[in-house]
Amino acid sequence: PEEMRAYRYGSYLNGGNGGPYGDEFAPAAAWLRLADEMWDASTAPLPNGEPAIPAIWGTDAVHGHTNVVGATIFPHNIGLGATRDADLVRRIGAATAAEIAATGIDWNFSPTVAVAQDDRWGRTYESYSEDPLLVAELGAALVEGLQGKAS
C-alpha cells in the first residue's frame, strides 16, 4: 500500500506462488484485507487536489482462483474442451467469479481462447480444442459464468 500511495500505478497483477504480505499460503481474508488497503491507498486524496483514480487488481484465474489456499481448482481448458459441455464451463465460471469476488480482486485474465494447432506447443493445455467453433462456444460460456448474463 505504501508504494501505491507513492506511485499511484493504475493496475497490478499477482503472480503465481505470490500472496499477500509475502505469504503464499494466505487465506482469502488476507487477500481481501490487502485489496481493501490497496483501494484505500489508490483513492487517498492527492496533495494537489487532483482526482484519485482507483487501481484495479488482476489475477490469472484460468482454472479457478488457484493462488488462494482453499479455492476450487478446476481442470485446465483442454480437459473442459473434452467434455464439450458449455453449461459445465458456465458453472465453473460462476464458481470462479464468486471465489475471486471474495478476495476483493476486480479483474481476471480469463478465459484463454487459444486454438491449439500444433500439439508440440507448450501451452496446448490452455486451449479448449483445435476446433475454433468449440473454443468460441466454451470461451463465451466461461465469460458468461464469470460476468453473468447481459441484461
What are these model-derived regions, one by one?
Residues P1-S151:
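Glycoside hydrolase catalytic-domain context in secreted enzymes
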